[in-house]
Each structure stands twice: as C-alpha cells, then as structure tokens.
C-alpha cells in the first residue's frame, strides 16, 4: 500500500496535524507534517490509541426529578420541581502489588500479548518492536504511580483543611457566646444599679414599682435581643462569605435567653414594645419608586381606562382626573379612543407606541392585488342612479325602461325588487340604481351617488325643483358625478320645461344649449315619450367619461342593499366594480364573510359569473351586511373569518364608546334628564337601507320633553324574540313592509302589545309624533264662567249646609269646580254638587238670579263669601 504523509493522515482521521504529531511522539516516532507514514507505523499508532481509550474512566451521570409541595404564607401550597444529579466515575482499581506484575509481564513478554490482541481484533493488525513495547509499559507504570501519589496528597490536604475550618468555627462560636454573655451581664448590672438608686421612689407606689420592674425587664431583654440579632447577622454573613453551611443546631444563640424573653413579653405586652419589635423577614414590603418611571405604552384603536392605567402602572383615578382636565367624563370601564389615550399618556410623561391592528386587513389586500394597468382594462357599462324628489316619477321611469327592454317571456319574471337593474340597448348595457326621494333616505342617496357614474335627475315639469331635488344635486356635486336632467310629466298641461331650466340654473345646473355641461331631456314616463333620447344621452355621457374596468381577476364591489330572508338567510345585492365574481368564491363583506352559494340577477336567473357593472343578488354570507360596505373576494377563508371578527369587535367597541361618551359641558344636562319621557320602539324593516333611514328620522323627532329610543332594529319579519323584548321593555312594535309570524302574534295577543304596520314612511313618522304628544302630561286652562255672592247660609237635613247666593257675574253650572273666596283669599277649592232655584234642581243659573249652592265636603261658608265657578279646558300639547 502506498505511504501517506502525516498531513493527509490527519485529514483522513479528522484531527489536527499537531495533535497527530503529538500522538506519534507519544508512541516513539518523531514526525513532521511532511514526513511519510508507513503501514507498520499506522498500525502501531492505532494500537496505542486503542490502549489509551481502554484506560479512559467511565463516567455515569444520573438525573432524578421529583416534586415538592411547600406551604406558603398565604396558606396555599406551592409545587417546586427538584432535580438531583449524581455523577459516578468507574476506574479499574490498580493495586501496588499489581504494578510489579504488570512490569514483569510487559517488559519480557509484551510481544506475545500484542500479537494476541492483534489476532483478537482482525480489523487492526500491527506489530510492536520490543523497544517500543517496553517504552509504552514504562510510561503507563509511571503514570499510574503519579496518579496514586496525587490522590493521596489531595485526601490528606482536604482532611487538614476540614480540621482547620472546624477549629476556626468553634473559636468563632465561643467568642460570640462570650461577648453576648458579657454584654448581658453589663446591661443587668446597669439595671440593678439604677433600681437601687431609685428604690425610695418606687417603694412609695408598690403597684407602679411592680409594673416598672416588668418594663425594666422588658427593656433589658429588648437590648439583649438586639445584640443577639446583630451577632446572628454577623454569623450569617460569615457563613455566606465562606460558602459553608451553618449547623442546624443553634445552641450558640442563647436559646434559654430567648425563652425567658418570650415569657416576659407574654406577661407584659405593651404597644411600645410591639412597635419596637422587628418585623418578620417573610413580610413583603413595597418600596415606592424614588423617581418617575417612563414607560413605552402600546395603544391600539380602542382602550379602556382600566387597561390604560395598568399599562402606565398608575391608579385608574389618576387617569380619570386627567381626562376630566381634558374635558372628557369617563368611568374606569369606559372605552376611549386612541387620540385621547395618547394625549393622557404623553401628558403623564410616557412614550406612546401606536399599534397597527389592521395588519391582517392589509395583508389580505396585498394578497388580492390584481394587475390594474390600463392595458388590461376594458370598457364597462355605466352605472346610472335615478334621483329626484318624491312622486316626481323616478320609479315610473325605471319601470317603463325595464318593461320595454326586458323580454317579457323570460321564466320567473321579476322575483324581488332589489333596487338595481341592468338593461340591454342597441348601443350597449346600462345599469340603473333607484334611490328613494324622501328626506329620511339621505344616506341611501349619498351611497348611490358614491357608487354611480352618471346621475339622472328627474324633475316634474309641473312641480319644479323641490328640497330633495336640491339635495340630490348636492350629493352629485360632492361625488363629482355628471348630471343628466330628465324633465318628466311633459304630457301635462301645466308642464313648463323652460321654467325648470331657470330654477336649476340657480343651483349650478346649466343646459348645454345655454353654454353649460348638463343635458336636458324632456320625457314622459307614463307614455314613454323621449325615453330613447334619454338612453342615448346616458350612453353619450358614458363615452365621454371613458369608463374602464379590469374584467379578469379577483372581484370587488359594493353592497347596494341587504335583507334577511326567512327561507334563504342573509341576502345581499352587490354591484361588481372590477374583476369577475364566480359562484363559490370566498367573499369578505364588511363585518360579514361567507362563500357565494347562489348568485342571480334582478330577474331571478341563476348566474355562474358576474362582470363589472352587473348587480347580483348573492346568498351564503354569515349575516346581513350594512348597505354601503365594500365587498371583496379573498383567497383564504381563515383570514376572512379573522378579519370579519376583528371588524365586528372594532365596530362594537366604537358603538359602545359613542354610546357612553359624555363631555364635561353636558354633565348637568345628563344629570337633569331624569324627567324626560321616553318612547321605546322596536323597528323591523324589509331592507337594510330602510332601517338606517327610519332610525335617523325617528331620532330627529326627539325633543327636550320626549325622546324616541330605538330599543332594537333589524331586517326581517317580527319574531317571537322581538315580541318578548317589547313586552319586557314596554316598547311599541313597528313593522315597515314586514309582518309578525304566528309565534310573535301569540305573544302580542297575550301581552296586549302595541304593534303598527306601515308601508309609507310619512304615516309612520306622523303616528310616532302623535304617540309622543300623547305621552306628555296633560295641561289644563282654568276658565272662570261665573261668580256668586253668599247672601245667607242655612242648613238642610238632606244636603247639609246650603249657601243662598246671588249670581253677580256670568253663569253657574252644576258639577263644575268652584273656589270659596273670603276677603280676596282663596280658602277652599272643590266641586259644586248641588244647585237649586227655589225647590227645583237646575243645571245652571244665569246672572242676576238667586240660587242655592251646596259645596261638597265643606261646611265653613259664611255670609259675604264669593263663590267662583270655573271649568278646566285641556291644552293640546306638542312634543316640540
């Protein structure tokens, strides 16, 4: 076999070159890194290494784990994990006699042993020369002898050190004992001398002398205990510095003296001795920080006062004081917003770190990013919103467009009015949105203007611009949406389109023929006049706008309307803005999420896909979304659920914060609200937009005298839960385009609840206003109708005391209220129950006639009194 160098052998054995050279030197070969190694030398080195490994001591480590239950000061047991580690080293014992045997066997006959070992291990075949074998044996014998000598020296030195330590420890204990006894004797001698010096004074009052003796003994024991504790502390410090364990026997601590001291304390315990007694070492003591600690306060979107106080390590009352200084009234459990919490924390000297809690939402938005470059964009249909005042013909116009452009023979027909339609024309598709015209639906009109591309403003030619017409113009201008004016009802005789142009010019709507940018189209929704011209004007405006959208990609849109269907669950109408919505997509819609289980258009036809500008009705959401929420398709269902739950919690916290927020300037107003009457209402409507509109309208009815309180509101029919809540809260049930189910009707009949159904918002608002007026305490006006002067008083057995009177003014009627006036002072107010003229009962007596008047439950009538007769006229009150 070819020889190798020492360096290459070291690489092969995976050790350093220096270490391998040292191993060769131990065997007896002097090598360098560049020298060659023969096969025989390698075998010799291998045998040596094997021999060294056989003499390595075997070390065994054991770990034992256990649990100890330790009783704490509070009475609870505490579990402590204990681990015991044991280490054993196994070394083959080598006796002194065996050294000679090894020497005799190795020196002359080591060649045979090496040969036998080589045969026993066929993998390592080597031959040692006699000189090498003798050298190895001598080295081993010398090493064993040196190890034995070192061990014996270590044992002897350890024994000497332990003996010296024990002697020093004993001397220290004796010295401490001597000093303590000497100090105690000195204190006792001083006390005795002091007692002899004042013996004459103490003997005069034996009881006082006895008490003072006890106090003196206590004082002596107190001083002795201080000295003893000082000595114990010194011994403890010495023990810690030496690192030695103190003996468990504490005889050097004067146990007899401690026993006497405890007995003396039991005999005469006083408040002075108790205050001077040292506190237990187990007692926890809180040290107030010497300087203010500035912390890093992490604040999220919302935080309660208690949480902010915990983060700042201060009391909640300090936070409340600071909030009052800032003009905010808050309780310890109230939620405050991020800005207010930041002001409080920075004012108190802390550093504020604002937490971004919407990172998950941002990650979802990044994950669903699509290629929105202009090259991939395609032309899309315009979204047109029809706006105008109520009864100006918006819905009639939309119905005519649908009836002429939608094929009547399609199966299913129109199944549900969802407020959004798309129609096909010769020049392309148009999507229409219908918005209500009543003032209560302001939010819906604003939402429609934000969603739309073009606004068609319907104005009646016989009525002109009305408040909702002006409001629609304002919404369209705020959204920067072009306006096409449709002058409706031109078939009427009173129609005056030119007057409409003049009125709208005042609000910034100028016709094109007058140099403006707005198209005016004269139409008749009843007869279809000018409808095609209107559609052409809409498509022309869309071409000018150059509307484009990404068709291929993840879909996103906006919720136009939503409601709860009893058979299908939550239903949402979504207008797709970009991308393509597919059946089965996971969609995140405001506070709700879900998979699209079904999708259909405004005619009830099932769809598998929906592109941009197409309104669709989808099923499968976890709840009813809020109209106006943004809907987007996401890839991960888990992330969609987490984002929806986060938004729900954030919405709930914000709602709670708005509900409980009270400014300092409104404090006295809130305190004086006890006398305000409340009209509790539970509102259920057919669609989400109506809930918002009616809620706003009813809240605006609240006044200083009466307040409308919406206990609950929602979408869908009136259920048993709603009826139970109305019975518990004494509320009125209002259904807008919905009805109560059978179980709810049973509770309504049983509890005799007040329920009202409406389909027109005018009627709802008027009747709620009347109900608020009926809640107010009735007021009456006193109308004086007559005066009678008492001329004589006589008694009648049947009626009691009767006053003979002369009517001097007005008329006196039976069963009216009266006042008895004497010397211009009212002395009685009651009811007139008997009125006679001569012997006949009469209902009234006029001016200048005599009559007899019987006053109910009053007998102190005198001659000359004036009886004033008046009636109460109720005053019709208004809640305004």
UniProtKB/Swiss-Prot annotation:
Amino-acid positions noted as binding GTP in the UniProt annotation, renumbered to this chain: 388-395, 434-438, 488-491
Segments forming domain tr-type G: 379-548
Residue numbers spanned by region G2: 413-417
Keyword Transmembrane helix on entry: no
Subcellular location, record wording: Cytoplasm
Source species, domain of life: Bacteria
Pfam families with a match to the protein in the record: EF-G_D2, GTP_EFTU, GTP_EFTU_D2, IF-2, IF2_assoc, IF2_N
Keyword Cytoplasm set for record: yes
Region (G3) location: 434-437
Region annotated G4, chain positions: 488-491
Major location category of this protein: cytoplasm
Annotated GO MF terms: GTP binding; GTPase activity; guanosine tetraphosphate binding; translation initiation factor activity
Cellular component annotations (GO), alphabetically ordered: cytosol
Swiss-Prot/TrEMBL keywords: Cytoplasm, GTP-binding, Initiation factor, Nucleotide-binding, Protein biosynthesis
Residue segments, region G5: 524-526
Positions of region (G1): 388-395
HAMAP family: IF_2_B (MF_00100_B)
UniProt function note: One of the essential components for the initiation of protein synthesis. Protects formylmethionyl-tRNA from spontaneous hydrolysis and promotes its binding to the 30S ribosomal subunits. Also involved in the hydrolysis of GTP during the formation of the 70S ribosomal complex.
Protein known as: Translation initiation factor IF-2
Organism: Baumannia cicadellinicola subsp. Homalodisca coagulata
Protein's gene: infB
């Amino acid at each position: 076999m070819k020889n190798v160098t020492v360096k290459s052998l070291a690489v092969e054995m995976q050790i350093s070159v220096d270490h391998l050279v040292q191993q060769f030197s131990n065997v007896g070969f002097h090598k360098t890194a560049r020298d060659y190694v023969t096969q025989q030398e390698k075998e010799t080195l291998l045998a040596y290494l094997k021999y060294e490994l056989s003499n390595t001591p075997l070390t065994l480590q054991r770990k034992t784990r256990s649990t100890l239950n330790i009783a704490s000061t509070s009475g609870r047991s505490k579990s402590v994990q204990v681990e015991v580690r044991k280490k054993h080293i196994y070394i083959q014992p080598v006796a002194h006699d065996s050294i000679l045997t090894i020497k005799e066997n190795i020196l002359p006959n080591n060649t045979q042993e090496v040969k036998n070992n080589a045969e026993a291990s066929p993998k390592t075949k080597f031959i040692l020369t006699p000189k090498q074998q003798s050298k190895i044996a001598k080295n081993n014998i010398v090493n064993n002898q040196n190890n034995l000598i070192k061990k014996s020296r270590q044992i002897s030195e350890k024994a000497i050190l332990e003996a010296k330590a024990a002697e020093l420890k004993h001397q220290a204990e004796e010295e401490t004992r001597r000093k303590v006894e000497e100090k105690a004797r000195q204190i006792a001698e001083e006390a005795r001398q002091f007692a002899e010096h004042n013996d004459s004074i103490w003997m005069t009052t034996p009881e006082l002398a006895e008490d003072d003796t006890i106090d003196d003994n206590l004082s002596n024991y107190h001083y002795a205990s201080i000295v003893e504790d000082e000595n114990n502390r010194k011994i403890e410090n010495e023990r810690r510095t030496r690192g030695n364990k103190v003996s468990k026997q504490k005889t050097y601590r004067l146990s007899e003296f401690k026993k006497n001291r405890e007995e003396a304390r039991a005999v005469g315990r006083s408040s002075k001795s108790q205050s001077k007694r040292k506190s237990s070492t187990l007692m926890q003591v809180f040290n107030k920080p010497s300087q203010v600690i500035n912390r890093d306060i992490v604040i999220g979107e919302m935080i309660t006062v208690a949480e902010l106080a915990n983060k700042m390590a201060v009391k909640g009352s300090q936070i409340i004081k600071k909030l009052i200084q800032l003009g905010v009234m808050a309780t310890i459990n109230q939620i405050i917003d991020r800005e207010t919490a930041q002001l409080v924390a920075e004012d108190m000297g802390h550093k504020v770190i604002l937490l971004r809690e919407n990172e998950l939402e941002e990650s979802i938005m990044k994950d669903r990013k699509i290629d929105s470059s202009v090259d991939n964009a395609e032309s899309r249909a315009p979204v047109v919103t029809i706006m105008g005042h109520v009864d100006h013909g918006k819905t009639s116009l939309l119905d005519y467009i649908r009836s002429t452009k939608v094929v009547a023979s399609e199966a299913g027909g129109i199944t549900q009015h969802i407020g959004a339609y798309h129609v096909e024309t010769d020049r392309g598709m148009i999507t229409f949105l219908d918005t209500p015209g009543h003032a209560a639906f302001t939010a819906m009109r604003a939402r429609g203007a934000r969603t739309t591309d073009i606004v068609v403003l319907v104005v009646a030619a016989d009525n002109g611009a009305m408040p909702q017409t002006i409001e629609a113009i304002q919404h369209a201008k705020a959204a920067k949406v072009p306006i096409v004016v449709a002058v409706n009802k031109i078939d009427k005789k009173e129609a005056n389109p030119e007057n409409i142009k003049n009125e709208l010019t005042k609000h910034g709507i100028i016709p094109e023929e007058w140099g403006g940018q707005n198209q005016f189209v004269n139409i008749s929704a009843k007869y279809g006049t000018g409808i095609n011209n209107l559609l052409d004007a809409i498509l022309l405006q869309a071409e000018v706008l150059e509307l484009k959208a990404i068709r291929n990609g993840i879909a996103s849109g906006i919720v136009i309307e939503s409601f709860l269907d009893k058979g299908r669950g939550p239903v949402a109408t979504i207008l797709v803005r970009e991308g393509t919505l597919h059946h089965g997509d996971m969609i995140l819609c405001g506070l709700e999420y879900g998979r699209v289980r079904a999708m259909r258009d405004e005619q009830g036809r099932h769809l598998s896909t929906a592109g941009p500008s197409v309104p669709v009705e989808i099923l499968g959401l976890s709840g009813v979304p809020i109209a106006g929420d943004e809907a987007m398709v996401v890839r991960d269902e888990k992330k969609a659920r987490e984002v929806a739950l986060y938004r729900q919690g954030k919405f709930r916290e914000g709602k709670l914060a708005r509900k409980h927020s009270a400014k300092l300037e409104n404090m006295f107003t809130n305190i004086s609200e006890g006398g305000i009457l409340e009209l509790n209402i539970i509102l259920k409507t057919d669609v989400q937009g109506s809930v918002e509109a009616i809620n706003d309208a009813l809240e605006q009815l609240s006044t200083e005298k009466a307040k409308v309180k919406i206990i609950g509101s929602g979408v869908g029919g009136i259920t048993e839960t709603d009826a139970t809540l109305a019975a518990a809260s004494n509320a009125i049930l209002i259904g807008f385009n919905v009805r109560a189910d059978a179980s709810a009707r049973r509770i309504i009949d049983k509890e005799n609840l007040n329920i009202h159904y409406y389909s027109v918002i005018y009627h709802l608002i008027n009747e709620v206003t009347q109900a608020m007026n009926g809640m107010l305490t009735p007021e009456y006006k006193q109308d004086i109708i007559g005066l009678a002067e008492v001329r004589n008083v006589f008694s009648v057995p049947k009626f009691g005391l009767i006053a003979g009177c002369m009517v001097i003014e007005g008329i006196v009627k039976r069963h009216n209220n009266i006042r008895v006036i004497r010397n211009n002072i009212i002395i009685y107010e009651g009811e007139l129950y008997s009125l006679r003229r001569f012997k006949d009962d009469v209902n009234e007596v006029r001016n200048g006639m005599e009559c007899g008047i019987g006053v109910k439950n009053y007998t102190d009538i005198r001659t000359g009194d004036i009886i004033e007769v008046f009636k109460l006229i109720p005053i019709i009150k208004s809640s305004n």
